Every structure is written in structure tokens, then in C-alpha cells.
């Protein structure tokens, strides 16, 4: 923990970059090892829990939980459109039907891993990276946090997840839009908890998507709908944030 604190005090941005690198390497390694062991997400979950516990402990020891969004939202449900866009986003994963894509054990491991992923990615990209960069330039921080979150998903091409090029590129597009949306949610609420829950649920529902979602047209349709929903919600929240700042 002392080494983490030393790096954090020296440069919050490089601290964020170090976490991004560690996250990408360990989670990708976990996926590869899980495939070798023959149990989906078995090793990935262990790595995800380890990273989550280390990060939580670091934030708690240094009294940084609220500074990085682990606190109650300060926005009303009405100002967030009662999170209806998030519900619509979650429904996209199920629009082609519902089926069990893994065995019972693997489904449980997959769901738990996806909530670890949601937690880690929100804290790392929104809490750490965006939080560090916004001190210098808010607009640059929004752009970088959104783009790095989207582009970071291209690692699925080589981590053993089985994603093909087209599917992965489509994922990068809507992940960038989702990254923008989550940043705007964080800015409006001062909390990452709603982002973590929505992110984790969206990822977890992938374990139940219907067969049509894997077809070329299904992938394109899903990507377009997700990009439209997340972009529209992000733009609405951006205007809401600007309006509130102008009245303060």
C-alpha cells in the first residue's frame, strides 16, 4: 500500500495509467488461464476480486472513498430521467431472446466477474483517470476518459474471449459512447455507484443473450441502438450539467 500511496502522491495520472495497465494485463491473463482450465471466468474472477479488494483497501486507508465516487448520489432521480435510458440499455442485451449461454457454475462465475469488471472499470476510468485529468482540463478529461474506455475494449481481440474483428470494433464504438454517458452521470451525481450497478448488470446480462445477437445483423443492430441510447442520454446530462453550473 505504501508503494501505491507513493505513486498516487507523485502523479495521479500515472497512478491511473498503472491501474489501467494492471487491470488489462491481469484480466486478460485470467481469461486465457480460465480457458486452459476449462471453466469460463474461473481465474478471471480471482484476479478481479484481488484487484477490487486492493483498490477498495487503498481508497479506504487514505480516506478517498467519496473522492472517487463511492458515496451516495447527490442528484434526484427525476434529474436523471429516473434512469430510464439505463433500463433501455439493459434491455438491448435481451432483445434477441433469452437463453443460458453457460452451465450453472460458469454462469455464476461470469456474473460475479462482470460485476467486478463494472466496479473496476468505473473506478479506474471515471474515478481515477477522469478525476486526475479534470483538475487540468475538464473537456480533455471527458474526451480521454471516454476514448480510453472505448479503445480499451479492443483488447478482447487477444484475450481469449473469442470476439471477432467486426464485433470488437462495434463494441469499441458503443463502449466509447457509454464511457461518455458514465462520465456525465458521474459529473451530475458525484457518485459512481449507479454507474457501477448499470455497468455490472449490462455485462452480466451478456450471459443470457439470445442466439440472434451473435448474427451479423444482430451485432450491428445492437451496436447502433446502444450507441444512440447512451449518446442521447450523455448529451442530455451534459446540457443538464451545463445548465446547473450556469445557475450556480
Task: Give the ranges of each region predicted by the language model.
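Alpha-helical transmembrane segments in multi-pass membrane proteins
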Residues: 10-59, 84, 108-109, 220-231
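Juxtamembrane helix-loop-helix connectors linking adjacent transmembrane helices
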Residues: 4, 32-43, 59-123, 130, ...
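Functionally important transmembrane alpha-helices
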Residues: 168-220
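Aromatic-anchored segments of alpha-helical transmembrane domains
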Residues: 20-29, 87-96, 115, 147-155, ...
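Membrane-interface helix/loop boundary segments of multi-pass membrane proteins
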Residues: 120-146, 187-191
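C-terminal membrane module of polytopic membrane proteins
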Residues: 200-248
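Hydrophobic alpha-helical transmembrane segments
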Residues: 13-18, 79-84, 108-111, 139-144, ...
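N-terminal membrane topogenic signal
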Residues: 1-19, 76-77, 191
